[in-house]
UniProtKB/Swiss-Prot annotation:
<feature type="binding site" description="axial binding residue">
    <location>
        <position position="97"/>
    </location>
    <ligand>
        <name>heme b b566</name>
    </ligand>
</feature>
<feature type="transmembrane region" description="Helical">
    <location>
        <begin position="33"/>
        <end position="53"/>
    </location>
</feature>
<protein>
    <recommendedName>
        <fullName>Cytochrome b</fullName>
    </recommendedName>
</protein>
<dbReference type="InterPro" id="IPR027387">
    <property type="entry name" value="Cytb/b6-like_sf"/>
</dbReference>
<keyword id="KW-0813">Transport</keyword>
<keyword id="KW-0472">Membrane</keyword>
<keyword id="KW-0812">Transmembrane</keyword>
<feature type="binding site" description="axial binding residue">
    <location>
        <position position="196"/>
    </location>
    <ligand>
        <name>heme b b566</name>
    </ligand>
</feature>
<feature type="transmembrane region" description="Helical">
    <location>
        <begin position="347"/>
        <end position="367"/>
    </location>
</feature>
<feature type="transmembrane region" description="Helical">
    <location>
        <begin position="77"/>
        <end position="98"/>
    </location>
</feature>
<keyword id="KW-0249">Electron transport</keyword>
<dbReference type="InterPro" id="IPR005798">
    <property type="entry name" value="Cyt_b/b6_C"/>
</dbReference>
<keyword id="KW-1133">Transmembrane helix</keyword>
<comment type="subunit">
    <text>The cytochrome bc1 complex contains 11 subunits: 3 respiratory subunits (MT-CYB, CYC1 and UQCRFS1), 2 core proteins (UQCRC1 and UQCRC2) and 6 low-molecular weight proteins (UQCRH/QCR6, UQCRB/QCR7, UQCRQ/QCR8, UQCR10/QCR9, UQCR11/QCR10 and a cleavage product of UQCRFS1). This cytochrome bc1 complex then forms a dimer.</text>
</comment>
<feature type="transmembrane region" description="Helical">
    <location>
        <begin position="226"/>
        <end position="246"/>
    </location>
</feature>
<dbReference type="GO" id="GO:0006122">
    <property type="term" value="P:mitochondrial electron transport, ubiquinol to cytochrome c"/>
</dbReference>
<keyword id="KW-0830">Ubiquinone</keyword>
Length: 379
């Protein structure tokens, strides 16, 4: 008799995705982040669900309801901080996952990569709206500043902003709709992640060498299930340490002050995972130009397959490209630091130079380096 996992309509989908899936024998720990992102998403949906049971999306009671969750609900403080810091872990895994894709040329799987870029935008939108919900000072002013960027769109900008706000300022209507969208988006993300996986399994995984691994495949279970469990344990250890020892490390103290439209915080800044994009936005003195640079700083990922000029897929055997890749990583860290600094003298110019370097590396220097390396192969 054939095994039920190979015949049952539902079980055979699970089987072909997580059990009998042929996987390259040489994929490193950089390939763990897909499963970690899945774990993060499940954790966020579960903790978010329990938070939503006690949260009220009204301007008068939102801040108090979050306080109530932390003080009065059983383990409410734990659920709240798991959710807030879970978002940080989600973005750490996301950035490492995307970085892995860039380094090893995984973007050559066009469909998988493009769904991934859409996923990145969806997760960023979800995180932004989630940050507005506690209705603290940084929530309110962050929502005001970021939504206001849409007013830079010619002709329809102002109408668009007021339509999103549901009035003439960020108010009750804005908070209610942000809560609704923040609740629904993770489920859309889960569906997109399924499509992401579907497209990936059409081609099979890439591997560090960038060469075809069809001649050397191993079953996903038990090899990579065990490996993923180890990754999950490391993730849980890191998240638990953050939540239990310093839950407010990555948050902003201003968000413990209830939202006040009459009092602007001295430095309006988003959560740490948006700072690199925020620095690029601020480095351009023109409003529309800044918004375009902000969007393009992430949308540029969709251009990666077209900017690939190398004869080799992976950067494993390309030392010049490797140097430029790590320069890009350093540049993003500098942008993240600048995004959290006030707009004054050394920081403005550093931010502008880092922004120019960011686009130059991706659009000009890395494709040129690949061409140079192609010629070096002939020697």
């Amino acid at each position: 008799m054939t095994n039920i996992r190979k015949t049952h309509p539902l079980m055979k989908i699970v089987n072909s995705s997580f059990i009998d899936l042929p996987a390259p024998s040489n994929i490193s720990s950089w390939w763990n982040f897909g499963s970690l992102l899945g774990i993060c998403l499940i954790l966020q949906i579960l903790t978010g669900l329990f938070l939503a049971m006690h949260y009220t999306s009204d301007t008068m009671t939102a801040f108090s309801s979050v306080t109530h969750i932390c003080r009065d609900v059983n383990y409410g403080w734990l659920i709240r901080y798991l959710h807030a810091n879970g978002a940080s872990m989600f973005f750490i895994c996301l950035f490492l996952h995307v970085g892995r894709g860039l380094y090893y040329g995984s973007y050559m799987f066009m469909e998988t990569w493009n769904i991934g870029v859409i996923l990145l935008f969806a997760v960023m939108a979800t995180a932004f709206m989630g940050y507005v919900l506690p209705w603290g000072q940084m929530s309110f002013w962050g929502a005001t500043v970021i939504t206001n960027l849409l007013s830079a769109i010619p002709y329809i900008g102002t109408d668009l902003v007021e339509w999103i706000w549901g009035g003439f300022s960020v108010d009750k209507a804005t908070l209610t709709r942000f809560f609704a969208f923040h609740f629904i988006l993770p489920f859309i993300i889960a569906a997109l992640a399924g499509v992401h996986l579907l497209f990936l399994h059409e081609t099979g995984s890439n591997n560090p060498s960038g060469l075809s691994s069809d001649t050397d495949k191993i079953p996903f279970h038990p090899y990579y299930t065990i490996k993923d469990i180890l990754g999950a344990l490391v993730l849980i250890l890191a998240l638990s340490s953050l939540v239990l020892f310093s839950p407010d490390l990555l948050g902003d103290p201003d968000n413990y002050i209830p939202a006040n439209p009459l009092n602007t915080p001295p430095h309006i800044k988003p959560e740490w995972y948006f700072l690199f994009a925020y620095a690029i936005l601020r480095s351009i003195p023109n409003k529309l130009g800044g918004v375009l640079a902000l969007v393009f700083s992430i949308l540029i990922l969709a251009l990666m397959p077209f900017l690939h000029t190398s004869k080799q897929r992976s950067m494993m055997f390309r030392p010049i490209s490797q140097c430029l890749f790590w320069l890009l990583v350093a540049d993003l860290l500098i942008l993240t630091w600048i995004g959290g600094q006030p707009v004054e003298h050394p920081f403005i110019i550093i931010g502008q130079l880092a922004s120019i370097l960011y686009f130059s590396l991706i659009l000009i220097m890395m494709p040129l380096a690949s061409l140079v390396e192609n010629n070096l192969l002939k020697w």
